[in-house]
Amino acid sequence: MELKVLFSEDPAFVLSRAGHFLSSQPVHHNLILSTLHARVAHAEQGRYWMAIQRADIVGVVLQSPLTFPATLTPMEPTVATAMADAIAEAGIALPGVNGEAAAAARFAGQWSERTKSAAIPFEGNRLYELLQTAEVPAVEGKLRQALPKERSLMILWSRAFQQEIGESADGTELRVDRGMAAGQLWVWEQSAEVVSMAISREPVQGVVRLSGVYTPREKRKHGYAAACVHALSKKLREGGYRCILYTDLGNPTSNSIYRRVGYGAVSEALRYRFK
């Protein structure tokens, strides 16, 4: 059966063509769905590929911003191979790939063979979904949205977070401004001091992804991040949303925190760097 790879730079077209496929698994496809919706709302350069078999979409890969690694949906090995081949044949130099473990591994392996570059796995992630809002030890303070006067602090913390997870901090100010305008930046306040932050991404198909959970080093080991995530997750769940987040498998502390809050593992993902 013939497998075609269709390229586009138009996120609206990709949503119109692949929307049904992506919405069929809103948790597994959330990262790509939310990125596409964001690019439609706020124009930013991007590259998008759709794998088509018998007129059906069977996989999607995107790269946006263009300095970022590619992100892919879960897909069959043959589809991941075809995607890597098509992108390599187009002469596009990807810095890396992120995605569901098996698909990312197959893509990275094929990319390495086709481009004669090294594919280095450097981080394992786990996708979690909130199954229940478990009770956690009480922590003094409260959850609230970040205030305009805290913009500089949110930018500082967001850059520090990106640095800690090994991602580019390009565009941080713009993302913070958009997040604050949309009411998506949240903080944990204790005794009139902001001690932790978290981001709730735009809801897509009833799913909200939490990200950017950060506490400065001098404020860690007090339970602030757990309290912030617990309160935010509970608030979103009570609003009828499903909550998800990704964690670094190299950080057992954060994984245990999220399990205590009520999150359960869904799947694993891998991040590769190409050199």
Stretch-by-stretch model annotation:
Residues 54-55, 62-67, 133, 156-211:
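Acetyl-CoA-dependent GNAT
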Residues 3-9, 20-26, 33-92, 96, ...:
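Conserved donor-binding loop and adjoining core beta-sheet/short helix segment
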Residues 77-86, 211, 215-217, 221-237, ...:
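Conserved acetyl-CoA-binding loop-helix of GNAT-fold acetyltransferases
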Residues 53-57, 62-140, 272:
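Acyl-donor-binding surface of acyltransferase catalytic domains
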Residues 28-37, 98, 166-174:
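A short, aromatic/hydrophobic, helix- or strand-capping loop or linear motif
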Residues 1-31, 133-167:
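Short amphipathic alpha-helix that is part of the acyltransferase structural core
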Residues 187-190, 200-203, 222-235, 242, ...:
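Recognition helices and adjacent regulatory flanks at domain boundaries
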Residues 98-104, 245-256, 271-275:
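Conserved beta-strand-loop-alpha-helix junction that forms the acyl-donor binding cleft
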